[in-house]
């Protein structure tokens, strides 16, 4: 049976997962009466909620007697570690672009990697049923993007398909047709079958799966030879050492699941069970004369955060797992399948340093742990600094902002204050397209500020670029915070009197503790307030004169917003039911002593 391996590249929310749904339905993977639901590929609850793909997944369908392995890639640069490896398994890529938005920066990130690996591209312009869409302009924009990424002559000559995933059709022109058959025919026609060279077994491990029943499972493409069940093999590791072991069970992909087989031929993707201690990039080779394939590099982390046990006064109320041993085991387990993540012990026995690719990457991990019933405290995200050629260097990112013209000057002002440099400024209709080069540190907390200052109109995206010399200090949050003076339950009476001081993160009737951040001050500098004072019930006041209290509703903060909001001396308490911000040192006098000590040491 012939094989085609194809990866799908798309920006967040351009309809990649919907396209895969269509392919699965078209090739009758499901029985006609089977309930499937939408978003079949995004199996993780968090992925469905946010509409992003985090872990790459595989599906396989059979069309006209040819087996097509579909590989879904994460679109976000924070999961860059996933993307590169996954593309190694593919022979071609489907580049999916929104007919209105055109190619976006995250797409560019993945496409660049795909073109470097010499994959054959097919461009699919989706959502042509949307009003105001501009498929022809988008086609030209894609061509320019390919050209800017140094595509070869052959790659620039790419086939294009138009259609709507929602309505369920794709065609090689703008005329709607019955279904997505033209696209599937195109895949068979334009994507080359896997290139198989003669020789002994070689298979590179490009991705892994973990099951509590089978342990770690190695996934990759058999690039030559045949692998059989129970066959003795050599595992060639990235440092050149060779381990002799045995492939106990083999699985190939079928529909949405896996099917157990006795042998896998070259060119197909397979999952191997029973190999101990392997890493991404290792080669499974012949037992007698092993030959290694070149290793793959995984993107380095650019950010770190301190994860510790929850040591607030409300500790242990909501969570099932609260000890440092629980947190440690969970983080170590996460590193087995989340490869861009590193965990180290810190000086303190109760906390761990976790390194990741960015705020989104770490935020997803914290959110997942929270839902599993963990309680933890996390500190402010720190950017990793490197020494290059004797200079202190920090990670820089390319920031792309699309914003209505009237706000463009505000955006440029905000970004340049945070040490960003403007490189590109173009007008697209009534929208200004701006591109900046800026330090990753400057991006922390920028999104919330940007949305406030542009009335929610700005669309921003960023991707890691390279390490460059340190840019100096970057201004953080301008305003101070409001801190609870003592533990208790907030009352409408006190919050009403304190409203002119700023806005709150709590409503009346919520429990607070000493040192917890309950709001933002209107001015710079922190202010300790008493939000839980009740009204004196003496007979001196008329009973009805102050019954009506108008309090502005609290501001809701998501986990990522909290991570960007807090400063050096603050942390976030994360439990299954609450996300609270607090000072690291809860007692006000202790905080003052510490601040004094710091200033004398600095002097």
Spans of features found by a protein language model:
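P-loop NTPase switch module centered on the Walker A-proximal segment
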Residues: 1-103, 137, 141, 208-211
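Conserved structured catalytic cores and adjacent interaction surfaces
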Residues: 1-18, 77, 100-112, 118-120, ...
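Residue-level signature of catalytic and energy-coupling elements of molecular machines
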Residues: 13, 19, 51, 72, ...
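Interdomain boundary/hinge elements
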Residues: 35-39, 149-161, 194-204, 240-253, ...
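Canonical P-loop GTPase G-domain recognition
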Residues: 120, 130-189
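Conserved nucleotide-binding/hydrolysis modules and their immediate coupling elements
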Residues: 202-305, 315-317, 479, 488-538, ...
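Long insertion/accessory domains within large nucleic-acid-processing enzymes
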Residues: 253, 258-261, 438, 451-567, ...
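A short, contiguous, amphipathic alpha-helix enriched in charged residues
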Residues: 312-335, 548, 552
């Amino acid at each position: 049976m012939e094989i085609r391996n194809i990866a799908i590249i798309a920006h967040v929310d351009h309809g990649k997962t919907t396209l895969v749904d269509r392919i699965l339905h078209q090739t009758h993977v499901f029985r006609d009466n089977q309930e499937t639901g939408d978003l079949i590929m995004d199996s993780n609850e968090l992925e469905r909620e946010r509409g992003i793909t985090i872990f790459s997944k595989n599906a396989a369908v059979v069309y006209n007697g040819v087996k097509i392995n579909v590989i879904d890639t994460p679109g976000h640069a924070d999961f860059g570690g996933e993307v590169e490896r996954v593309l190694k398994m593919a022979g071609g890529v489907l580049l999916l672009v929104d007919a209105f938005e055109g190619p976006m920066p995250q797409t560019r990130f993945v496409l660049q990697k795909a073109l470097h690996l010499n994959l054959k591209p097919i461009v699919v312009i989706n959502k042509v049923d949307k009003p105001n869409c501009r498929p022809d302009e988008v086609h030209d924009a894609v061509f320019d993007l390919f050209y800017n990424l140094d595509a070869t002559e052959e790659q620039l000559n790419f086939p294009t398909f138009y259609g709507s995933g929602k309505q369920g059709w794709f065609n090689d022109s703008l005329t709607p047709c019955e279904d997505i058959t033209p696209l599937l025919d195109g895949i068979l026609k334009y994507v080359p079958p896997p290139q198989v060279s003669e020789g002994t077994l070689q298979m590179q491990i490009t991705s892994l799966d973990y099951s509590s029943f089978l342990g770690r499972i190695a996934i990759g493409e058999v690039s030559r030879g045949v692998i059989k069940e129970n066959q003795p093999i050599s595992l060639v590791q990235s440092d050149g050492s060779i381990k002799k072991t045995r492939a106990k069970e083999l699985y190939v992909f079928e529909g949405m699941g896996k099917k157990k087989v006795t042998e896998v031929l070259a060119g197909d993707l397979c999952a191997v069970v029973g190999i101990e201690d392997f890493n991404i990039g290792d080669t499974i080779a012949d037992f007698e004369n092993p030959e290694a394939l070149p290793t793959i590099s995984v993107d380095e982390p650019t950010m770190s955060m301190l994860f510790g046990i929850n040591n607030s006064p409300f500790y242990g109320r909501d969570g099932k797992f609260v000890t440092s041993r629980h947190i440690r085991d969970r983080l170590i387990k996460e590193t087995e399948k989340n490869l861009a993540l590193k965990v180290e012990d810190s000086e303190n026995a109760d906390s761990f340093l976790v390194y990741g690719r960015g705020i989104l990457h770490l935020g997803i991990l914290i959110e997942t742990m929270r839902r599993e019933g963990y309680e933890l405290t996390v500190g402010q995200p720190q950017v990793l600094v490197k020494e290059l050629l004797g200079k202190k260097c920090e990670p820089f990112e390319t920031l792309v902002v699309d914003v209505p013209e009237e706000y463009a000057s505000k955006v440029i002002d905000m970004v340049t204050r945070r040490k960003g440099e403007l490189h590109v400024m173009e007008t697209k209709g009534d929208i200004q397209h701006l591109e900046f080069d800026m330090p990753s540190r400057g991006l922390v907390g920028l999104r919330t500020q940007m949305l406030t200052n542009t009335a929610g109109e700005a669309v921003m995206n960023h991707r890691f670029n390279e390490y460059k010399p340190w840019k100096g200090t970057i201004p953080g949050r301008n305003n101070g915070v409001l801190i609870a003076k003592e533990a208790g339950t907030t009352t409408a009476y006190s919050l009403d009197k304190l409203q002119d001081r700023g806005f709150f993160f709590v409503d009346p009737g919520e429990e607070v503790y000493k040192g917890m951040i309950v709001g933002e001050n209107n001015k710079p500098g922190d202010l300790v307030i008493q939000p839980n004072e009740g009204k004196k019930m003496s007979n001196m006041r008329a009973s009805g004169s102050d019954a009506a209290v108008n309090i502005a509703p609290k501001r809701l903060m998501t986990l990522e917003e909290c991570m960007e909001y807090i400063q050096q001396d603050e942390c976030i308490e994360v439990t299954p039911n609450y996300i609270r911000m607090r000072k690291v040192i809860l007692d006000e006098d202790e905080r003052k002593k510490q601040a004094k000590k710091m200033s004398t040491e600095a002097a």
